[in-house]
């Protein structure tokens, strides 16, 4: 390995895994229990990226606009619990790895890079997803939404990786599909790759000014 980078970090949803179908199904299953309207998948896409609480908050705001119905705090907490239940039961029913993800991760691991996952996804769901696609063994660290006091776009997860592995920020390359990924990386002093195929609230990743922009996950091999 002859690279300035020693560790490569990855977002999960929209970067490694296309989890939108299962997330949308779980959101709508929870909404249905409270007789709220069903959201189209392309709309749920714009709600992803800031963790489960904000995802459900956006869903409820939309449902209120559509139906005029609002939930009490207790009902909102119950709906969040139901979403978590449905998603735990449907983590990988329809979700798939994006093209070239597994092969590229294996190559990077063989080349000696430390690999890590940094996601805002609920921590308890992260390992089951990685295991379902048989890539969990490739990562030396996995950080979810409850692993640390702060989540992306805060740089704390990347600072944590620096401390754990004894690295400087410039030795970390972070790969993601949303502005939160790019903001977190740049705030920490890390280099950022933006992927065009992910979610990012339906906005071009170029608007967030990553250091590189790729359409294919395998293109990472060109810069390391």
Curated annotation (Swiss-Prot):
Q: Which CDD domains match?
A: HAD_PGPase
What cofactors does this protein use?
Answer: Mg(2+)
Protein name according to UniProt: Phosphoglycolate phosphatase
Q: List GO molecular-function terms, semicolon-separated.
A: metal ion binding; phosphoglycolate phosphatase activity
Decide whether keyword Methyltransferase is in the record.
no
Which GO BP terms apply?
Answer: carbohydrate metabolic process; DNA repair; glycolate biosynthetic process
Name the catalytic site residues: 11 (nucleophile)
Alphabetic keyword roster: Carbohydrate metabolism, Hydrolase, Magnesium, Metal-binding
Which organism's genome codes for this protein?
Answer: Mannheimia succiniciproducens (strain KCTC 0769BP / MBEL55E)
* Chain positions recorded as Mg(2+) binding sites: 11, 13, 177
Q: Which HAMAP family match?
A: GPH_hydrolase_bact
Job description of the protein? Specifically catalyzes the dephosphorylation of 2-phosphoglycolate. Is involved in the dissimilation of the intracellular 2-phosphoglycolate formed during the DNA repair of 3'-phosphoglycolate ends, a major class of DNA lesions induced by oxidative stress.
Q: Which PANTHER family match?
A: PHOSPHOGLYCOLATE PHOSPHATASE
Record's GO cellular component terms: cytosol
Question: Which family does this protein fall into?
Answer: Belongs to the HAD-like hydrolase superfamily. CbbY/CbbZ/Gph/YieH family.
- Look up the domain of life of the source: Bacteria
Query: What class does this enzyme belong to in the EC scheme?
Result: hydrolase
User: For this protein, what is the EC number?
Assistant: 3.1.3.18
Catalytic activity line of the entry: 2-phosphoglycolate + H2O = glycolate + phosphate
The pathway where this protein functions is: Organic acid metabolism; glycolate biosynthesis; glycolate from 2-phosphoglycolate: step 1/1
